[in-house]
């Protein structure tokens, strides 16, 4: 028979089978961010000025933050409603999907908001669409703002099925804060080229969160030529950086770059 000391060592005293610290920590809870449409254009189908979006609590894909690039993109859409109203819009890597929501409020004919097919991430986008576009109720007919889980470069069928009959490309493709994925540049450009309508344009917006890799970020626009896409700088603006204490010059991290991509003639 084992002694009391031996029993303690096997069943608790040494915590041989104890869970590691943090094993029972609850995952971070989702949270909300408010966006104000400061200049709603006359052409907008909806006059909503406040857009309240839910963000996942945490995400290895950085979908838990409302990035400067998403805010810039949303403002750009309101400033250029002719690019959206009555047109078909695709957003890649949508995260909280603010630009897609604004496109839906503006009166796009069809919006498809996509991100990596993670259940929490895609479910959160669907929540935002349901609540911002449809008032928290399921749409009674085919939704003009749809949500899809999508991996760049994969089969386009699930995205194209949302397009009107006879149309195979989107009039506007949105890429907000995606070019930091340097290994994915080719897949992003392939997807953009193949899903962009002949006379369409892509709006690419990003901030150099790692200033020492800015050259690699910008390489995206050089590589675009290999895919028959022409890059045009719209502007570079300076906002407050996302994270004040991140490494690298704050002046560089505060930049927001915006480009158009169009098919070469």
Curated annotation (Swiss-Prot):
An individual GO BP term: methylation
EC identifiers of the protein: 2.1.1.-
Example GO molecular function: protein-lysine N-methyltransferase activity
InterPro entries xrefs: EFM7 (IPR025784), Methyltransf_16 (IPR019410), SAM-dependent_MTases_sf (IPR029063)
Record's keyword terms, sorted: Cytoplasm, Methyltransferase, S-adenosyl-L-methionine, Transferase
Record has S-adenosyl-L-methionine as a keyword: yes
PANTHER family assigned: HEPATOCELLULAR CARCINOMA-ASSOCIATED ANTIGEN, PROTEIN N-TERMINAL AND LYSINE N-METHYLTRANSFERASE EFM7
Family note: Belongs to the class I-like SAM-binding methyltransferase superfamily. EFM7 family.
UniProt function note: S-adenosyl-L-methionine-dependent protein methyltransferase that trimethylates the N-terminal glycine 'Gly-2' of elongation factor 1-alpha, before also catalyzing the mono- and dimethylation of 'Lys-3'.
HAMAP family, per database record: Methyltr_EFM7
Protein name: Protein N-terminal and lysine N-methyltransferase EFM7
């Amino acid at each position: 028979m084992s002694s009391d000391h031996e029993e303690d060592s096997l069943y608790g005293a040494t915590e041989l089978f104890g869970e590691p610290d943090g094993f029972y920590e609850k995952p971070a809870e989702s949270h909300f961010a408010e966006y104000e449409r400061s200049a709603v254009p006359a052409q907008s189908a909806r006059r909503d000025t406040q857009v309240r979006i839910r963000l996942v609590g945490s995400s290895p894909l950085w979908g838990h933050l409302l990035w400067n690039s998403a805010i810039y993109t949303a403002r750009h859409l309101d400033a250029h409603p002719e690019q959206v109203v009555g047109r078909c819009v695709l957003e890649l890597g949508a995260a909280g999907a603010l630009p897609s929501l604004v496109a839906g409020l503006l009166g796009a004919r069809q919006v498809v908001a996509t991100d990596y097919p993670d259940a929490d991430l895609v479910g959160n986008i669907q929540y935002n669409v349901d609540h911002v576009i449809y008032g928290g109720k399921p749409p009674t007919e085919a939704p003009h703002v749809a949500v899809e889980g999508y991996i760049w470069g994969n089969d386009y069928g699930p995205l194209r099925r949302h397009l009107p009959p006879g149309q195979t490309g989107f009039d506007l493709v949105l890429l907000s804060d995606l070019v930091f994925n340097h290994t994915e540049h080719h897949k992003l450009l392939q997807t953009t080229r193949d899903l962009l309508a002949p006379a369409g344009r892509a709006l690419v917006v990003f901030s150099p969160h790692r200033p020492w890799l800015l050259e690699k970020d910008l390489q995206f626009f050089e590589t675009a030529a290999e895919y028959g896409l022409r890059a045009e700088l719209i502007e570079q603006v300076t906002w407050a950086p996302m994270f004040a204490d991140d490494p690298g010059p704050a002046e560089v991290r505060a930049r927001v770059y915006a480009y158009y991509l169009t098919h070469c003639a």
